Amino acid sequence: MKRILVCPVCKSKEVELDAGGYTGKYYCKNCGYVGSFILEMTEGEYREMMEKEKFERKEDEKSKPKGVRED
């Protein structure tokens, strides 16, 4: 089963080795994250994680009072 690299900050799959892999760090093309900590998972695990986050965002929106803006 193929594993993918995922950015721990923005959850993007647009991650590659930084500096040709010499530093052991990764670079996210989406948010610019550079670091050695990276998420590694299967496509199925990635879909599960994204569905869970989508559900949690919907639940957060439901709990906010109507008409109140967050600046």
From Swiss-Prot:
SUPFAM superfamilies: Zinc beta-ribbon. Residues 52-71 are annotated as: Disordered. This is Uncharacterized protein AF_0483. It comes from Archaeoglobus fulgidus (strain ATCC 49558 / DSM 4304 / JCM 9628 / NBRC 100126 / VC-16).
